[in-house]
């Protein structure tokens, strides 16, 4: 019997051990398997729902409470039109997803503005929470992003009404107009700006959006949506906010970058740096702190010191709590928008140092601005602005001029950054101006990319240009000439060419070198003040350098008579002056073209006519025979005093400087009709009747018109005049040959004398002999080496035989 009991007990123990072993196998298998690794079909729907609920639980709510909330919450369906709108927003309107944070912060700022206004008349409005802030917190573990404000909050009815529909009325009309605008290729930004749809940009990055809100007149409620439907329920946690709203985003997998602190901080500083209310981000930093040393370390040190009794007695009185330095990660709210929008204050209240500090922070420059202007524009559109002129031109200022977008002007709407991606907020020639523009009149459009289409921007642009030119005009003359003009002079010249409406204002800012002073720059106003009594034109000469311009034959008589001549030494200068029809009632005269006339008396006129009659044979001979295909006509010059002749362009032709510039254009293909027309224009050949060469030519022509030497001399004079007048020769070889012929004649060398031929060189035999000797020596050396090797081999073989 006892044996049976023992046997039964053993069976029970074996059975129990087997069950425990099976359980251990199952548990081990469950632990090792990664349940979140994949979403296999083997899972039940309840398991999936449970895992999602655990993933998106809010602070203070566990998974079961979340599930209970969803079961009891009141469900609402978006209207069909709202669904269309949602798809439009998510898929097409927002090209840049990062603006979701800008929109949420902007809405938070509006809510804070509302509660602040209410508090002015209701002293209890801020009782729930006195601080007015926006706080942003990233939760990487739960994949959540929280944006909390202490604004006015929303009641249950407002949650349904404001967040359940995109527009309270007119949604159908809006969609119809948007469809029509898209079909016509027009901008939809003006239409979108009429509807508050910024909140829905959250669905660009979130699968679900949860809004927790507390209004002073209602209990705290939770609104939740996945963009298909939404639900609202009272918050079982009670009043956790005090007052305000928390928007929680359950981010999409591809939007996980928005949980990075650096990303969030950069977006806040980019878009919301100048919001009126403080914006905080929950962030970490490493700090070094001192902590009491551990007891073990202190005991160890005491044990080591106890070896010396005297030392212990001396140090007992000096013992203090021992500390050590430890690095700790500390989490706290970090303020993001510490730079204040000084443009919101009256300019009289802002100190110069504040402008300089703001410029350095705003533009990331280390130097102070050269000039600035702070103003408020009113009228068709009201906006505030601060504009700056930098001390030096930005690098690559003219790279891709006209096609490159300028990002120096930043547009804000109610202190919310909208964009700096403009083609035409400022004209191209003012692409160096930096500043901010803040308007309350512009709509916070959904599609900021098309904002530049807005009609009010044209008004803003016009006022910005006027204020910029006023700012530049006020720069002191010394500072303007020495600094501004060196850095931005080309921009002003381009402005004269491009900006017709402001051409007169820009002309007053022009500076050029002139014959009045060897180095100082002069303005057109100063030139006009120094003009001679009967002078009715502003004279200018264009050249590659000042030296070339002032040594040109065209300015000889002008300078001799005391007229001031402006020197144009930059490639854009002549274009600039051509774009100016006149200045202060005085027209411009290019001294390298026809039209230069001097006031002369009757006696001078009679003398000139007599000279023209005297040289008529030479002039006709040049025009009809010697230079028949090269010039339009030949005339006696009034502008030459030292040079024998010059080549003068017609009033609408190219000067030598302009022709050189046009031919240097990289895109010049020769197919442009107007270019070919100007390039093919014949010039007027002017001669100096007092020059000895010209007088001798007249004598020779009268003696023999068919003299080849005289014909060659005429052509050489023409080609020399072409070069001295700034033009290029089409055939430089022919010009060189003619110069050589003239030199031969001047040295009494026969023009047909040939160049002596070089003597033929005999072949050098010594080189070949030396090569043969060298080869023979090499062969003898090789033979000698071979004999020595054979002898060594024979001796070695004999020695081996002897050993054997």
Curated annotation (Swiss-Prot):
Motif stretch (SRT pseudosubstrate motif): 42-44
Subcellular location(s) per record: Endoplasmic reticulum lumen; Sarcoplasmic reticulum lumen; Melanosome
Residues binding ATP, per UniProt: 107, 149, 162, 199
Example GO molecular function: RNA binding
Compositional bias ranges of the Acidic residues kind: 289-317, 757-792
Keywords (A to Z) from UniProt: Acetylation, ATP-binding, Calcium, Chaperone, Disulfide bond, Endoplasmic reticulum, Glycoprotein, Hydrolase, Hydroxylation, Nucleotide-binding, Phosphoprotein, Sarcoplasmic reticulum, Signal
Chain intervals for the UniProt region annotation (Disordered): 288-323, 750-804
Chief place where the protein resides: endoplasmic reticulum
BP-aspect Gene Ontology terms: actin rod assembly; cellular response to ATP; ERAD pathway; negative regulation of apoptotic process; positive regulation of toll-like receptor signaling pathway; positive regulation of Wnt signaling pathway; protein folding; protein localization to plasma membrane
Record's signal peptide: 1-21
Modified residues (N6-(2-hydroxyisobutyryl)lysine): 168
Alphabetical list of InterPro entries matching this protein: HATPase_C_sf, Heat_shock_protein_90_CS, HSP90_C, Hsp90_fam, Hsp90_N, Ribosomal_Su5_D2-typ_SF
Modified residues (Phosphothreonine): 786
Catalytic activity: ATP + H2O = ADP + phosphate + H(+)
Glycosylation sites: 62, 107, 217, 445, 481, 502
Motif Prevents secretion from ER, chain ranges: 801-804
Phosphoserine found at: 64, 172, 306, 403, 447
Matching Pfam families: HATPase_c_3 (PF13589), HSP90 (PF00183)
Post-translational modification: Phosphorylated by CK2. N-glycosylated cotranslationally at Asn-217 by STT3A-containing OST-A complex: this glycosylation is constitutive. In response to various stress, 5 additional facultative sites (Asn-62, Asn-107, Asn-445, Asn-481 and Asn-502) can be glycosylated post-translationally by STT3B-containing OST-B complex, leading to a hyperglycosylated form that is degraded by the ER-associated degradation (ERAD) pathway. In normal conditions, the OST-A complex together with CCDC134 prevent glycosylation at facultative sites during protein folding, thereby preventing hyperglycosylation.
Similarity comment text for this entry: Belongs to the heat shock protein 90 family.
Subunit structure and binding partners: Homodimer; disulfide-linked. Component of an EIF2 complex at least composed of CELF1/CUGBP1, CALR, CALR3, EIF2S1, EIF2S2, HSP90B1 and HSPA5. Part of a large chaperone multiprotein complex comprising DNAJB11, HSP90B1, HSPA5, HYOU, PDIA2, PDIA4, PDIA6, PPIB, SDF2L1, UGGT1 and very small amounts of ERP29, but not, or at very low levels, CALR nor CANX. Interacts with AIMP1; regulates its retention in the endoplasmic reticulum. Hyperglycosylated form interacts with OS9; promoting its degradation by the endoplasmic reticulum associated degradation (ERAD). Interacts with CNPY3.
Function, in words: ATP-dependent chaperone involved in the processing of proteins in the endoplasmic reticulum, regulating their transport. Together with MESD, acts as a modulator of the Wnt pathway by promoting the folding of LRP6, a coreceptor of the canonical Wnt pathway. When associated with CNPY3, required for proper folding of Toll-like receptors. Promotes folding and trafficking of TLR4 to the cell surface.
This protein's name: Endoplasmin
Gene name of the record: HSP90B1
């Amino acid at each position: 019997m006892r044996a049976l009991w023992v046997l039964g007990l053993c069976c029970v123990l074996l059975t129990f051990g087997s069950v425990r072993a099976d359980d251990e196998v199952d548990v081990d298998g469950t632990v090792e398997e990664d349940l979140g690794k994949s979403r296999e079909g083997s899972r039940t729907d309840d398991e999936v729902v449970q895992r999602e609920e655990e993933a998106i639980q809010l602070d203070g709510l566990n998974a079961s409470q979340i599930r209970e909330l969803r079961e009891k919450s009141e469900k609402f369906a978006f209207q069909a039109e709202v669904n269309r709108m949602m798809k439009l927003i998510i898929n097409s309107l927002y090209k840049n997803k990062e603006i979701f944070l800008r929109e949420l912060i902007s809405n938070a700022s509006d809510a804070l503005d509302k509660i602040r206004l209410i508090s002015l008349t209701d002293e209890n409005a801020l009782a729930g929470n006195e601080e007015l802030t926006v706080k942003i917190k990233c939760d990487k573990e739960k994949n959540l992003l929280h944006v909390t404000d202490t604004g006015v909050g929303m009641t249950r009815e407002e949650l349904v009404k404001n967040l359940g529909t995109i527009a309270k009325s007119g949604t159908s009309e809006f969609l119809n107009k948007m469809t029509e605008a898209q079909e016509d290729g027009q901008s939809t930004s003006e239409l979108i700006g009429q509807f508050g749809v910024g909140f829905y940009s959250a669905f660009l990055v979130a699968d679900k959006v949860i809004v927790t809100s507390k209004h002073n007149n209602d209990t705290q409620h939770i609104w939740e949506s996945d963009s298909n439907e939404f639900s609202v329920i009272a918050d079982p946690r009670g009043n956790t906010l005090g007052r305000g709203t928390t928007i929680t985003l359950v981010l999409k997998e591809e939007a996980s970058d928005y949980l990075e602190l650096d990303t969030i901080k950069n977006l806040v500083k980019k878009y919301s740096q100048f919001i009126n209310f403080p914006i905080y981000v929950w962030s970490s930093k490493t700090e070094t702190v001192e902590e009491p040393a551990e007891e073990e370390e202190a005991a160890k040190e005491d044990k080591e010191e106890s070896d010396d009794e005297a030392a212990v007695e001396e140090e007992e009185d000096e013992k203090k709590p021992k500390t050590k330095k430890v690095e700790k990660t500390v989490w706290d709210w970090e303020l993001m928008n510490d730079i204040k929008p000084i443009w919101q204050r009256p300019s009289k209240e802002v100190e110069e140092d504040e402008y300089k500090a703001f410029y350095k922070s705003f533009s990331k420059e280390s130097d102070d601005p050269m000039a600035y202007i702070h103003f408020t524009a009113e009228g068709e559109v009201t906006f505030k602005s601060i504009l700056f002129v930098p001390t030096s031109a930005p690098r690559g200022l003219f790279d891709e001029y006209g096609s490159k977008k300028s990002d120096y002007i930043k547009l804000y709407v109610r202190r919310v950054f909208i964009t700096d991606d403009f083609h035409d907020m400022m004209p191209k020639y003012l692409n160096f101006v930096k500043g901010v523009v803040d308007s309350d009149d512009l709509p916070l459009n959904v599609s900021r990319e098309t904002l530049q289409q807005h009609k009010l921007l044209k008004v803003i642009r016009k006022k910005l240009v006027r204020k910029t030119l006023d700012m530049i005009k006020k720069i002191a003359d010394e500072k303007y000439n020495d600094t501004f003009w060196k850095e931005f002079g080309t921009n002003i010249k381009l402005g004269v060419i491009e900006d017709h409406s402001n051409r007169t204002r820009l002309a007053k800012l022009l500076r050029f070198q002139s014959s009045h002073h060897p180095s100082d720059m002069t303005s057109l106003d100063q030139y006009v003040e120094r003009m001679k009594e009967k002078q009715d034109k502003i004279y200018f000469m264009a050249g590659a350098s000042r030296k070339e311009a002032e040594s040109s034959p065209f300015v000889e008589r002008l300078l001799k008579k005391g007229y001031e001549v402006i020197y144009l030494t930059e490639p854009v200068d002549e274009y600039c002056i051509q774009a100016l029809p006149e200045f202060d009632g005085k027209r411009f005269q290019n001294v390298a073209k026809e039209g230069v006339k001097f006031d002369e008396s009757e006696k001078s006129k009679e003398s000139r006519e007599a000279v023209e009659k005297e040289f008529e044979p030479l002039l006709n001979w040049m025009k009809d025979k010697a230079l028949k295909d090269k010039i339009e006509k030949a005339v006696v010059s009034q502008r030459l005093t030292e040079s024998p002749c010059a080549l003068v362009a017609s009033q609408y032709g190219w000067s030598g400087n302009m022709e050189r510039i046009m031919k240097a254009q990289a895109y010049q293909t020769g197919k442009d009709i107007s270019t070919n027309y100007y390039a093919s224009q014949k010039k007027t050949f002017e001669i100096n009747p007092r020059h000895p060469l010209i007088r001798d030519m007249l004598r020779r022509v009268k003696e023999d018109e068919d003299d080849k030497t005289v014909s060659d001399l005429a052509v050489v004079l023409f080609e020399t005049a072409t070069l001295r007048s700034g033009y290029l020769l089409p055939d430089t070889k022919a010009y060189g040959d003619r110069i050589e012929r003239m030199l031969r004649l001047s040295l009494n060398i026969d023009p047909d004398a040939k160049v002596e031929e070089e003597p033929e060189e005999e072949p050098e035999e010594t080189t070949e002999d030396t090569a043969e000797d060298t080869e023979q020596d090499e062969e003898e050396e090789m033979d000698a080496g071979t004999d020595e090797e054979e002898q060594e081999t024979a001796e070695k073989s004999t020695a081996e035989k002897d050993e054997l």
